[in-house]
Amino acid sequence: MNPFFPTTKKESFSSWKFRTLMNWYPMYFGTGGKILFWSSDSSELHVRLRLYIWTYNYVGTLFGGSLFAAADPFYMLMLFRALGPNYVVWDKSANIRFKKPGRSTLYARYLITEGDFAEIRQTVLTAGELTKNFLIQWVDKDNVVHAEIVRECYIADKQFYQTKKGDSQRAKLTFKRSEK
């Protein structure tokens, strides 16, 4: 399937297979969104959200919850797949700003640049962890922005994260013991 957004990236069999499985994953399928393209290096992704019975609201426009849910997991998954097993990646928060009602099919492009990856790797190497914001824009066929979502992702070195998590657990146990 041709991506809506022009790209120089290619989709591998592995990324095509992952995209296909994600499209049929019940929790994502229920959002009404469809992944159209997933680059082989997981740095670019394109999603479509059609206006139809599962995605429209009382006034006949795209339901805000559909816009939000169809945009949910991807930056976390892209980072997780691209950075590899030595990193921990979590979604921390997200917010949405509606610009214009969606009265037709909308598209979103997710892009993580080489500069983003370099910044992430360098910061995690020196600080152990990083929180980074990513912007998602839902646009129509004329590239008019209908909604913007900012997703905040937490990225850490796996060993740093496990140590931090262990320190937190030990602190909780110490606090509980001191209460007795």
Could you tell me what each predicted segment is?
Residues 30-61:
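Catalytic strand-loop segment that frames the active site of acyl-thioester-processing enzymes
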Residues 54-74:
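Hot-dog-fold acyl-thioester-processing enzymes
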Residues 78-115:
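Hydrophobic beta-strand-centered segment that forms part of the acyl-chain substrate-binding groove
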Residues 1-30, 54, 58:
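Alpha-helical membrane-targeting segments
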Residues 30-35, 92-98, 119-121:
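Short structured motifs
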Residues 31, 43-45, 90-94, 104-108, ...:
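A generic structural signal for short beta-strands and their flanking turns/coil linkers
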Residues 38-43, 99-106, 139-144:
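A short, structured loop/turn motif at beta-sheet edges
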Residues 2-12, 102, 113-180:
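HotDog/MaoC-like acyl-thioester-processing domains
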